[in-house]
């Protein structure tokens, strides 16, 4: 059983961030009916469903129905967002059985706008969501990248939530169900780059990804579907995982010898080998 299944409900985004992989795939969004079909096939195979690989989930017009479908299948729904559309979707999120919301605050700096207005909107909505029982995580995953505004962002968070933060490794607890996570900027795996010291990864161990056309991929970083394992609309998940390619990936990591060229070029997977 997986811990996480990343289901891309849309590959369309309202921003253009320099840290994002982007895609040449055809712009597409799943219908609520298509998504329901997917989660029915994931039922019993994962604990959490993340509505993201690429794209901005809050642009989806059927977001409420999608989140409800996850809960109806006995799984927990998680969303990663750039935060710009939180105000417009506040009631939908409050009404939904949403387990966790992660907001990429580092998306703001590369897109511009009124920082205080953005942060106030994000913090107001997250405060209400946390009071409603949803875990809210603010992300600053830009260490070593575009981080000139981090000081202003941290200052705003302290002013809004107070400064009595509890530190734990690279994260801080700002209040009940409210967290701040710092991390280094990472590079998406690129088949054109050189190989890295990759020996192990959690792909196909604790997670799997489903792109918005139904293509199953080993993890949330295969944004172009470079390692297609099958299609969830055409095959059961068991059949996909029983494919020769999927088994080679799993056993390759077990033997510390990744079978896929893209995996051997993944900076994130390299962290498991350091």
Spans of model-derived segments:
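Short loop/turn microsegments at loop-to-beta-strand junctions
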Residues: 204-206
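Structural recognition of alpha->loop->beta junctions
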Residues: 43-44, 90-110, 152-176
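Conserved alpha-helical substructure of the radical SAM core
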Residues: 1-101, 111-116, 120
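C-terminal accessory region of radical SAM enzymes
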Residues: 128-136, 159-196, 221-271
């Amino acid at each position: 059983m997986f811990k996480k299944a990343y289901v891309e409900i849309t590959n369309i985004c309202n921003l253009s961030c320099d840290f994002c992989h982007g895609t040449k795939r055809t712009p597409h969004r799943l219908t609520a009916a298509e998504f329901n079909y997917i989660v029915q096939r994931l039922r019993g195979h994962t604990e959490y469903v993340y509505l993201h690989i690429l794209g901005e989930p809050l642009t989806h017009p059927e977001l409420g129905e999608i989140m409800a479908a996850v809960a109806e299948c006995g799984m927990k729904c998680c969303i990663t967002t750039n935060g710009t559309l939180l105000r417009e979707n506040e009631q939908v999120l409050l009404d939904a059985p949403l387990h966790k919301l992660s907001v990429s605050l580092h998306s703001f700096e590369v897109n511009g706008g009124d920082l205080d207005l953005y942060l106030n909107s994000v913090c107001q909505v997250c405060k209400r969501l946390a009071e409603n029982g949803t875990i809210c995580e603010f992300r600053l995953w830009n260490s070593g990248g575009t981080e000139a505004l981090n000081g202003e962002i941290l200052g705003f968070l302290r002013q809004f939530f107070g400064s009595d933060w509890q530190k734990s490794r690279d994260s801080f607890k700002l209040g009940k169900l409210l967290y701040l996570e710092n991390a280094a900027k990472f590079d998406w795996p690129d088949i054109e780059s050189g190989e890295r010291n990759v020996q192990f990864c959690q792909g196909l161990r604790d997670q799997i990804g489903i792109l918005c056309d139904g293509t199953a991929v080993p993890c949330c970083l295969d944004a172009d579907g470079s390692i297609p394992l099958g299609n969830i609309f055409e095959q059961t998940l068991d059949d996909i995982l029983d494919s020769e390619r999927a088994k080679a990936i799993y056993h390759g990591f077990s033997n510390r010898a990744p079978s896929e060229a893209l995996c051997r070029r993944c900076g994130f997977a390299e962290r498991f080998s350091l």
